[in-house]
């Protein structure tokens, strides 16, 4: 079972993944140190943001986290790969429905047209898999590495689907509440609403994966 400390750790990582840390249009990557602190302080420019004290602890150069990669695609998919400088953990976090530029795309194209109609966010899943493939092929990212996966809301749906696509690799799991995944053609639910926390050894969501 996850400890309170572990739950807080993954919740903080999920919240940090909501921040806009990679801005290729202006050549800015706020992946570590003061830049990362500023990025997670801004968060998603709405309610998901860190206090100064929280941000400094999260990005502490000796015990905290850095960002190895963040992507955002035209389907609204966004993922962030984190690395802990003390424990050497890697965590892959999928962002929830975005409230700014991707709001209409996430809610209409993904949530209404794909999830409600077909059970899967197909466009974002395709982008998730393509991005994961590049990470898994790179030893500096996820190649040969054990890592954890988190997701919230739409990101929870993606984390669930990520696990379903590689059931044999999952050892344990946790995530925050997410959208339901698809139903069987016969009407039975394949994966229902995500529970508040998927506990260790619960294979309904991923924790430790090794590509």
Description of each model-found segment:
Residues 1-47:
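N-terminal low-complexity, Ser/Thr- and acidic-residue-enriched intrinsically disordered segments
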Residues 38-150, 165-187, 192-211:
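A conserved cap/lid and substrate-binding interface adjacent to the catalytic center
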Residues 150-155, 159:
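Gly/Ala-rich beta-loop-alpha elbow adjacent to hydrolase catalytic centers
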Residues 162:
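Aromatic pocket-lining residues of Rossmann-like dinucleotide-binding sites
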């Amino acid at each position: 079972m996850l400890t309170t400390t572990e739950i807080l750790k993954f919740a903080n990582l999920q919240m940090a993944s909501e921040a806009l840390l990679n801005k290729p249009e202006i050549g800015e990557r706020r992946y570590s140190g003061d830049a990362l602190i500023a990025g997670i302080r801004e968060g998603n420019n709405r309610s998901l943001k860190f206090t100064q004290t929280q941000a400094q602890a999260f990005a502490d150069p000796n015990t905290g986290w850095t960002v190895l990669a963040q992507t955002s695609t035209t389907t609204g998919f966004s993922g962030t790969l984190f690395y802990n400088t003390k424990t050497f953990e890697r965590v892959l976090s999928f962002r929830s429905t975005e409230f700014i530029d991707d709001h209409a795309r996430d809610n209409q194209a993904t949530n209404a047209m794909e999830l409600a109609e077909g059970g899967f966010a197909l466009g974002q899943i395709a982008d998730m898999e393509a991005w994961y493939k590049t990470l898994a092929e790179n030893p500096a990212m996820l190649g040969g590495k054990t890592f954890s996966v988190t997701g919230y809301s739409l990101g929870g749906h993606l984390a669930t689907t990520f696990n379903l696509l590689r059931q044999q690799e999952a050892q344990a799991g946790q995530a925050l509440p997410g959208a339901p995944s698809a139903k069987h053609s016969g009407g039975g639910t394949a994966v229902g609403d995500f529970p508040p926390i998927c506990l260790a050894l619960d294979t309904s969501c991923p924790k430790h994966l090794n590509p």
